[in-house]
Amino acid sequence: IQALKGISLEINEGEVVSIIGANGAGKTTTLQTISGLITPKSGSIIFEGKNLLKEKAHNICKLGIAQVPEGRRIFSKLAVKDNLKLGQFTIKDSAEKKEEDRANFYKVFPRMSERKNQLAGTLSGGEQQMLAVGRALMSAPELLLLDEPSLGLAPNFVMMIFDMIKEINKQGVTILLIEQNANMALSISDKAYVLENGTVSLSGNAKDIAKDDRIRKAYLGIA
């Protein structure tokens, strides 16, 4: 089954870019292809002038791309602080620098500091999602791929996660976002792409796409 059919995306440094579309449109496949979990038959993936097409996932991570998968996939029997440490395995910095990076994360997101000695599996769903994002940030990515970060979360945590995304972007991390809550995703994005059956059916400024009648009806629940 061919999930993607010649799609073309452009993400500029410092942007938040959203991909929206129905289930099965190819959104997750797109992220997994960029991060090296899936190898496409043809095409190119250019990141900072380098073609990543044949690169392994761990090398892509070292080059500055990190993915937060749908479903979080944290290490539930490890403490929060140990989950964060695992996110630093590709970094060659000193132990002191790694500790400093974790401390800076705790400063920006104090809720995680309060939970750092707690087993990850005992966190709420929203806290686990914050941890999953934090673990990805520990690899010091320039591009962060987020797959359905608000899926299954209570409304208060949805807002918290989106505030977290905005703060991460403010600190200079470029973000590619897949999100079921298209309204929220478009509200924080610079650009957006609409995927349908593995192809890009619409792209452009996120605010303009949010005003498109077809998109409003299909994805935003507005007749």
Task: Identify what each model region corresponds to.
Residues 1-223:
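Glycine-rich phosphate-binding loops of nucleotide-dependent enzymes
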